[in-house]
């Protein structure tokens, strides 16, 4: 492709909307253009990157025995209602775009395809003899993100590869899950990315087990915790650790103490010389469940620990037997709306009486009590006395009505000891999620009553797996991991072009003819090459070449009269001055080993 004919509009200044390097460089390099909030157009260079990534994904998925298909983007509401996910995905802060057709039928724009593919499987896969089946697609997805940001990292429209496998038993599902794990590792390696597999929460997709693949980058939205012995890695949402030991609180029987206006852990510790680990922190949340119930939560943690809201949501789901649609802290205005004025915020204890909810207008009249294991293990503690300006000192769980059931609700943190090896400790890194695989079990097949006939002639529900890769996000993650102060440094396998021939001065006939000759020789050798034949200044061309990040550059300049060119490797900026025939041989040796 001749650059003079390429739709290439580069920017010298950093667009104000772009916060992270990869977003800035894709905009400046003419790869993408913003159309609206979270909506981007893929320009020719970017589309070639997307196609190269997709080709690698297809190759590995086909090798793993998966079959490509294409499912509809418009989903009838009935399918999602059958699975029980329609309300959660469309109400309140749900992420599904939804609409009505002219007959008043509700439809959704697919953020994911479990419902559609499970429905099809129930119709088409009748016998165990047809199993296992693994179907995948590469398609545009839609999610109504509350706050689109970082370009393609968190958009409202994006390209994704999603796959769904169907099995006769759990063992077969686990085999395919492991095969897909290996396929994903090969995909990311071939794309030139350092991706870390980590234990992950299954989130709204659900299922028994899941694993994310994280590209490590300072701009990553996710915090991942890894053991320094290299044997454990998890998203912080899922991570476990051994917390530091609490400092014992020595004392006699429980006593009331006056703590006027001392409503925070920090203030209490400064005023009385306590350590945070000697206090109980009580939080109030409200959870909205999929059966319409608004459930108040009373959460107790050791004072030096932080709440992991994902773990809380999962615990509430298990305890209530319902899907949690929304979970957030209770604010003073929430209490006012409910007509509740008897809760002394800042002085609450783990034993706050349910009677304070008596006047609640829409909430249930009883707390769901959730106590973290660090709090449940405390012998004596400082906690709120459930009346203004009062705390209890040397309280025990017996004083508070008995030991609570222990849950894991705390955030694991860097520096803490690992559960699997007390000698190992957690370190933290930022990560960009580019892939996620799930063992769904029978969650969707049971909800949608999709069955097959087993060897015994009886019908049973499918075992299912789900496997996703964010293709467009992966492309930007590659830029985040591979760039320098001059621009993008694409890994060779996913670069839009393998090489670019840059003629410093197209007005010089010798340079122009040699550049043309080298370009045609590269094309004849099967190299996907660019030829910068623009009548621009050499400095402009070199800056553009650095910015767009083509892995190899052949510079035809003032030494062209001697038949000498420069061969430049973009990743390390190494320059070789070679006779043009030798430069061509060296480039072909590298690109076609």
Swiss-Prot record:
Keyword Membrane tagged: no
Major localization listed first in the record, in broad terms: cytoplasm
Coiled coil: none
Gene Ontology MF terms in the entry: aminoacyl-tRNA deacylase activity; ATP binding; proline-tRNA ligase activity
SUPFAM superfamilies: Class II aaRS ABD-related (SSF52954), Class II aaRS and biotin synthetases (SSF55681), YbaK/ProRS associated domain (SSF55826)
InterPro entries, per the entry: aa-tRNA-synt_IIb, aa-tRNA-synth_II, aa-tRNA-synth_II/BPL/LPL, Anticodon-bd, Anticodon-bd_dom_sf, Pro-tRNA-ligase_IIa, Pro-tRNA-synth_IIa_bac-type, Pro-tRNA-Synthase_IIa_type1
Function noted in UniProt: Catalyzes the attachment of proline to tRNA(Pro) in a two-step reaction: proline is first activated by ATP to form Pro-AMP and then transferred to the acceptor end of tRNA(Pro). As ProRS can inadvertently accommodate and process non-cognate amino acids such as alanine and cysteine, to avoid such errors it has two additional distinct editing activities against alanine. One activity is designated as 'pretransfer' editing and involves the tRNA(Pro)-independent hydrolysis of activated Ala-AMP.
Self-association state and partner proteins as the record states: Homodimer.
Name this polypeptide is given: Proline--tRNA ligase
């Amino acid at each position: 492709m001749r650059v003079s004919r390429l739709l290439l509009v580069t920017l010298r200044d950093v667009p104000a909307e772009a916060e992270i390097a990869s977003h800035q460089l894709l905009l400046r390099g003419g790869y993408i253009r913003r159309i609206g909030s979270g909506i981007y157009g893929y320009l020719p260079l970017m589309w070639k990157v997307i196609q190269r990534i997709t080709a690698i994904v297809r190759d590995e998925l086909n090798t793993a025995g998966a079959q490509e298909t294409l499912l509809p983007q418009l989903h009838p509401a009935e399918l999602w209602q059958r699975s029980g996910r329609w309300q959660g995905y469309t109400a309140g802060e749900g992420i599904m775009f939804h609409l009505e057709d002219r007959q008043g039928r509700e439809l959704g724009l697919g953020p994911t395809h479990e419902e559609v593919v499970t429905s099809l499987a129930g119709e088409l896969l009748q016998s165990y003899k047809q199993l296992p089946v693994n179907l995948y697609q590469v398609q545009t997805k839609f999610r109504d993100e509350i706050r689109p940001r970082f370009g393609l990292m968190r958009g409202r429209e994006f390209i994704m590869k999603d796959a769904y496998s169907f099995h006769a038993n759990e063992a077969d599902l686990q085999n395919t899950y492991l095969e897909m794990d290996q396929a994903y590792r090969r995909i990311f390696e071939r794309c030139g990315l350092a991706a870390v597999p980590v234990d992950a929460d299954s989130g709204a997709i659900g299922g028994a087990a899941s694993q994310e693949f994280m590209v490590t980058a300072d701009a990553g939205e996710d915090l991942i915790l890894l053991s320094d012995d290299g044997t454990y890695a998890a998203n912080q949402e899922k991570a476990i650790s051994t917390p530091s030991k609490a400092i014992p609180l020595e004392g006699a029987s429980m006593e009331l103490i006056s703590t006027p206006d001392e409503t925070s852990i920090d203030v209490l510790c400064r005023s009385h010389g306590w350590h945070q680990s000697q206090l109980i922190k009580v939080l109030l949340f409200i959870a909205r469940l999929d059966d319409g119930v608004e459930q108040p939560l009373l959460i107790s943690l050791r004072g030096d620990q932080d709440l992991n809201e994902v773990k809380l949501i999962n615990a509430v789901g298990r305890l209530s037997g319902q899907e949690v649609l929304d979970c957030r802290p209770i604010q003073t205005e929430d209490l006012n709306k409910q007509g509740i004025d008897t809760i002394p915020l800042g002085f609450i204890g783990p034993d706050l009486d349910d009677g304070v909810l008596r006047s609640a207008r829409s909430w249930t009249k009883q707390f769901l009590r959730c106590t973290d294991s660090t709090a449940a293990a405390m012998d004596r503690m400082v906690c709120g006395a459930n009346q203004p300006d009062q705390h209890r000192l040397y309280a025990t769980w017996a004083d508070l009505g008995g030991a609570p059931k222990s849950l894991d609700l705390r955030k694991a943190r860097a520096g803490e000891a690992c559960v699997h090896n007390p000698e190992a400790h957690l370190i933290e890194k930022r990560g960009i999620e580019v892939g996620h695989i799930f063992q769904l079990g029978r969650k969707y097949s049971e909800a949608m009553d999709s069955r097959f006939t087993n060897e015994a002639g009886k019908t049973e529900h499918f075992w299912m797996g789900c496997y996703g890769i964010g293709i467009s996000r992966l492309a930007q993650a590659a830029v985040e991991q591979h760039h320098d102060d001059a621009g993008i440094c694409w890994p060779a396998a996913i670069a839009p072009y393998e090489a670019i021939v840059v003629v410093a001065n197209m007005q010089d006939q010798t340079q122009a003819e040699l550049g043309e000759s080298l370009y045609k020789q590269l094309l004849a050798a099967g190299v996907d090459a660019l030829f910068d034949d623009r009548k621009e200044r050499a400095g402009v061309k070199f800056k553009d070449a650095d910015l767009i990040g083509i892995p190899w550059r052949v510079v035809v300049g003032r030494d062209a009269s001697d038949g000498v060119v420069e061969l430049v490797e973009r990743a390390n900026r190494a320059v070789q001055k070679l006779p043009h025939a030798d430069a061509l041989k060296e480039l072909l040796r590298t690109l076609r080993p």
